[in-house]
Regions:
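N-terminal Rossmann-like FAD-binding beta1-loop-alpha1 element of flavoenzymes
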Residues: 4-33
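Conserved flavin/dinucleotide-binding core of flavoenzymes
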Residues: 323-448
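Dinucleotide-binding Rossmann-like beta1-alpha1 core, especially the glycine-rich loop
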Residues: 50-135, 143-144
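Mid-domain catalytic core of redox enzymes
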Residues: 3, 238-360, 364, 368-373
Length: 448
């Protein structure tokens, strides 16, 4: 049983953990990052699954991010090399051509204007105008009455604001279920507006970025590499079993293999909420933990990735298919999976339904829905993988956001990082990076 001594140990090699590790290593702290899986990245990872290159779920980088870009610059990652920018989205309804919505006011101004004044077949002037009180009222409540807004779901708030059924179907469902895969009747209005509120002052930067490769390869491994270059350590395939606690202080961690790693200053738990609940059991009766993480519910996600003999869609673009099981989808053979002839990645809704189904059953449902929205791929499927995340997300249903804990805990030398912790963002890459930054800020305030 080996013992290794560090200034700080970070449990979890996702974006929150890598952010924490990089900022600590940058300040000459002897830091160790431990990741349970065989690759870094956590919910933003990619790997080879028995011969098929897959990722944890299909992700998009939002152009108004500000915290994550700082970390990527420190890791020498060039944003425009990592991403292919999208200035519009597709909403697929039936067999007809997709509804095109421009979303980049600076980089795709003409496309955005066409989307706003066009699409009359689907959205009348009345439909579009009905969205104004919804967005204005929602953003104002987000700023001034957040707890009240977190008590109502998106569907109920839209009805209250007079959003028409067509506007709700073609715009609100894609922007809610399409992003966080919950039905609008179960989706907190506070979370919905919280996705957009941080970008209001940076609205001109709005656009989406598709990754030009697996997220481990193009984003997360470069951060891990920079940590190592700065003298830190990053170990994969190491699952932490429990915290070592002495006199109320966290002094290290023990792995499932029986190895012990000691920390002289602190441990940062940057793993999933589910894992944090297991690791923090020695402190479960402390009010800080009892009233936050042990009350904060979790929710699942389910994704299917389909390998094809040709592209399913003519361009790689973020698409939504409201009123189907396809929360959001994208062809990725020209961006993330360039070694593939065709690759369709789909986030499924409701995820609970698909956790109970095997891959074959899931594929059949998906193929039928794809036929409904004009993407017939049944004769072109080569392989597929269904990837489930049972408890990886904190619940975005109404009434839960006040339960998110601060990064600094009352336990000496223990900090939390993860997008479930309290910061301005939710289940996003930006939230993960922001939480890591806040955890390290708290660390240095205590160890200056």
């Amino acid at each position: 049983m080996d013992t290794h001594i560090y200034d700080a140990i970070v449990v979890g090699g996702g974006l929150a953990g890598l952010t924490s590790g990089l900022l600590l290593a940058e300040k000459n702290q002897k830091v160790l990052v431990l990741e349970a899986e065989d690759q870094v990245g956590g919910r933003t990872s990619s790997w080879n699954d028995h011969g098929m290159h897959v990722e944890s779920g299909f992700h998009r980088y939002i152009g108004y991010y500000s915290q994550l870009p700082k970390i990527l610059r420190k890791a020498d990652v060039e944003l425009n090399e990592m991403l292919t920018w999208e200035e519009k989205i597709h909403v697929r309804v039936g067999q007809e051509r997709p509804v095109v919505m421009g979303l980049a006011p600076l980089f795709g101004f003409v496309k955005m204007i066409k989307g706003l004044i066009g699409n009359h077949k689907y959205l009348s002037l009345k439909d579009k105008l009905s969205l104004i009180p919804f967005f204005v009222g929602g953003l104002l409540q987000y700023l001034f009455h957040p707890k009240k807004l977190d008590q109502i779901d998106v569907r109920s708030f839209a009805k209250k604001c007079g959003v028409t059924d067509r506007a709700f179907r073609y715009l609100i469902i894609p922007l809610s279920t399409g992003i966080y895969f919950l039905p609008p009747t179960e989706y907190s209005a506070y979370v919905f507006f919280g996705l957009f509120a941080p970008g209001v002052m940076k609205f001109y930067k709005l656009r989406l970025g598709a990754f030009n490769g697996g997220m481990t390869e193009v984003m997360c491994e470069p951060i891990a590499r920079k940590i190592r270059e700065l003298g830190g350590e990053v170990k994969t395939g190491v699952r932490v079993h429990q915290l070592q606690v002495q006199d109320g202080k966290v002094t290290g961690v023990e792995t499932e293999a029986g190895d012990r790693y000691s920390c002289e200053k602190a441990a940062i738990l940057a793993t999933t909420l589910h894992n944090v609940k297991d690791l923090a059991l020695p402190f479960k009766d402390e009010p800080f933990f009892a009233n936050t993480i042990y009350k904060l519910p979790m929710m699942p996600a389910s994704v299917i990735q389909i390998e094809l003999d040709k592209p399913a869609i003519e361009i790689d673009i973020t698409s939504f298919a409201p009123l189907t099981h396809l929360a959001s989808l994208a062809e990725q053979s020209r961006t993330t999976f360039q070694e593939s002839e065709g690759r369709l990645s789909i986030i499924l809704t409701p995820p609970e339904k698909f956790l109970e189904l095997d891959g074959k059953e899931t594929l059949e449902i998906v193929l039928k829905d794809l036929d409904r929205v004009g993407i017939p791929i049944r004769d072109h499927v080569l392989d597929y993988r269904k990837i489930d995340h049972v408890d990886d997300f904190h619940s975005l249903r109404p009434g839960n956001q006040h339960l998110r804990p601060q990064q600094k805990t009352p336990i000496k030398s223990l900090y939390l990082a993860g997008d479930y912790t309290h910061q301005p963002y939710f289940a996003t890459m930006e939230g993960a990076a922001a939480s890591g930054i806040r955890a390290v800020d708290a660390y240095f305030k205590d160890h200056h």
